[in-house]
Amino acid sequence: MSGQTPYRQELRERILKAAMSEFFEKGIKAVKMDDIARRLSISKRTVYEIYSNKEELLLEGMKAAEQEFDEHMKDFSEQDNHHAMDILIEFYNCQAHRLSEISPLYFDEVQKYKRVQTYLENKHKKRDEDAYNFIDRGVKEGFFRPDTNYHIVVEVAREAVRFAMTSQLYKEHGLQIVFRNIILLFIRGICTLNGLKMLERIE
């Protein structure tokens, strides 16, 4: 992206934002490059000059969204008045809001893009490392139980999410319901009494 003019960079960001909005609303397959071009009142050729195919567009959009989320959570967690439960509740609220805006079709179809799946697998490994650091903080602050093997908890939680996605459990119950039940089940299990009292803020 080095050497791009400000206009070209702005256009790239506009295409990315429009595309991800369309993908979230309609699923990936239903959205054509023509649709994105029409929405922005530009030519399809212009879109292809910047993004050579839909997978490239999807991958960059996911990376941008993940980076924005990570930066928000980092800023939130570094504020002096926020403890582990504040951070956990903020994480829950952000994810619940995000899921409310995404069609189940998006999750069905995103699994078909190999480069995207490779990116997500690597991202999940990094998230696991962050999770252990966060849990350690929560234990020290007295919100999470010190007598729990969190490597097992994280592994089981990850498999529960994977099962919900691969079995398409969200089609029957809805994305937010599935997310809420999986997350709250594991959070309740690791919280001390102090943590459980704070957890009432999202229940």
Segments predicted by a language model, with ranges:
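Basic, helix-initiating cap at the start of DNA-binding domains
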Residues: 1-26, 30-42, 56-59
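Short hydrophobic/aromatic patch on the recognition helix
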Residues: 41-51
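Hydrophobic alpha-helical connector segments
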Residues: 60, 74-101, 154-157
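Short, basic, alpha-helical segments at the C-terminal edge of helix-turn-helix-like DNA-binding modules
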Residues: 62-70
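Hydrophobic alpha-helical segments that form the core
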Residues: 93, 145-166, 178-189, 202-203
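Short secondary-structure transition hinges
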Residues: 96-143
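Hydrophobic alpha-helical bundle segments that form small-molecule/ligand-binding pockets
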Residues: 125-153, 160, 164, 168, ...
